[in-house]
């Protein structure tokens, strides 16, 4: 923690604090959705506690937690500490709703995209509890009927309560802004207010730290070389135990690599199941962007990767002017099927599916050849309800997953997820 993770974590706020130095003196204005050190701990099969990085109380190591340190209001009442993940999400939002939040730390972009959905569902309960001075039904704060009435009035005036209406002085949000998130965060950011800046979160995983932003690059950061020893394998081939690797000094801009790391925490040559793209160099240090998980789906003899889907979607959006709230892909018997939630009202533009098929032929190895040979049918596009992915996000949290772990999935891990997302299918495009 002291030599590998904590220096990485604290360094990740440098660009944010450089832009807004006053935040260091105003921890009460920072809402960190990612950290939840009082949440219940999971246990391994043999009974040992298992914690994700977001659950660790940094004070155990003599360190602060981040820009939000010292915000006494942010602590969930002890008698509610065993609340389920969805209720914990409500409790944190209820506490923050009374405050003048200026910065939102999400890290996981699904948290940034999900918060407006959560707020739309929970604001009446928030208003009621602020007026009474309760949190989760427990007396906790001074009753504030004036603030409660202000929130209710804004919801009535706008017909919806977005984060901007709740926190009009919001200035910045921090989240991963690459891969699938790069396609939907620009539209999501509008719900947080005009002029709100989006800062790239550090790139990392539960296995270890990877890259820390040092400037305003929107979605890439230089490798965090003090934290791990990194190796990279060509992502054009599946990674195996005997895959040849190169060092950070040998990385080539414009190429994709499997990420392998070792560090003093005990991991040795761990393939973390992530693929990164080398953007350029900062000095001699490679700057990388996360492109997706190393997961495949196969149809018609074609292995489809997450990064191929994201790049094909990006090209299709650019060609059609469409905007999306999220997307996912599944394998049919002889084709791939894409579920698209549009960010704009009405049906997807005419020809969307044809253009997506064209771009998949450009980004996915073997796709065009399989189409030409008749082994693969054209991609099928299903336009789903605008809120389909936010509903699935809520379902996952209500089912017991910690919200920091509920992430975007180009390929859903279970068939029932696809079934729920496409339950209110509105159109074929």
Q: Across the structure, where does each feature detected by a protein language model lie?
A:
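Short, solvent-exposed loop/edge-beta patches enriched in aromatic
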Residues: 18-25, 97-100
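Hydrophobic alpha-helical transmembrane segments of membrane proteins
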Residues: 12-15
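Conserved nucleotide-state-sensing and coupling region of NTP-binding domains
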Residues: 25-42
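Amphipathic alpha-helical scaffolding segments
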Residues: 4-7, 30, 121
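Conserved AMP-binding A3 loop
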Residues: 1-10, 20-24
């Amino acid at each position: 923690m002291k030599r590998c993770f904590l220096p990485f974590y604290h360094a990740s706020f440098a660009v944010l604090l450089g832009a807004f130095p006053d935040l260091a003196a105003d921890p009460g204005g920072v809402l960190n959705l990612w950290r939840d050190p009082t949440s219940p701990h999971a246990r391994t099969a043999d009974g040992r506690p298992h914690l994700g990085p977001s659950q660790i109380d940094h004070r155990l190591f003599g360190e602060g937690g981040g820009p939000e340190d010292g915000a006494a209001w942010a602590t969930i009442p002890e008698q509610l500490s065993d609340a389920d993940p969805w209720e914990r999400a409500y409790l944190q939002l209820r506490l923050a709703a009374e405050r003048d939040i200026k910065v939102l730390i999400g890290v996981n972009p699904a948290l940034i995209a999900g918060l407006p959905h959560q707020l739309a569902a929970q604001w009446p309960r928030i208003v009621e509890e602020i007026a009474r001075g309760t949190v989760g039904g427990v007396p906790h704060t001074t009753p504030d009927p004036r603030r409660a009435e202000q929130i209710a009035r804004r919801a009535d005036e706008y017909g919806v309560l977005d984060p901007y209406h709740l926190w009009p002085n919001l200035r910045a949000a921090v989240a991963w802004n690459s891969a699938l998130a790069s396609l939907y965060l620009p539209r999501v950011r509008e719900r947080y207010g005009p002029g709100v800046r989006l800062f790239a979160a550090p790139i990392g995983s539960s296995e270890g730290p990877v890259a820390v932003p040092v400037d305003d690059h929107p979605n890439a950061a230089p490798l965090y070389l003090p934290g791990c020893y990194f190796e990279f394998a060509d992502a054009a081939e599946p990674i195996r135990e005997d895959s040849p690797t190169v060092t950070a000094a040998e990385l080539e801009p414009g190429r994709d690599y499997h990420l392998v790391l070792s560090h003093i925490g005990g991991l040795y040559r761990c393939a973390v199941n992530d693929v990164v793209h080398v953007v350029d160099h900062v000095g001699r240090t490679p700057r990388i962007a996360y492109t997706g998980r190393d997961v495949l789906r196969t149809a018609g003899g074609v292995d489809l990767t997450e990064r191929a889907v994201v790049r094909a979607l990006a090209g299709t959006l650019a060609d059609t002017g469409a905007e999306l709230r999220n997307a996912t892909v599944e394998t049919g018997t002889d084709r791939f099927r894409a579920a698209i939630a549009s960010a704009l009202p009405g049906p997807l533009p005419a020809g969307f599916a044809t253009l997506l098929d064209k771009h998949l032929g450009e980004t996915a190895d073997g796709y065009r050849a399989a189409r030409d040979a008749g082994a693969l049918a054209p991609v099928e596009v299903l336009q789903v309800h605008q809120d389909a992915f936010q509903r699935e996000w809520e379902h996952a949290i209500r089912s017991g997953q910690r919200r920091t772990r509920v992430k975007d999935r180009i390929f859903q891990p279970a068939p029932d997820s696809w079934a729920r997302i496409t339950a209110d299918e509105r159109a074929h495009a």
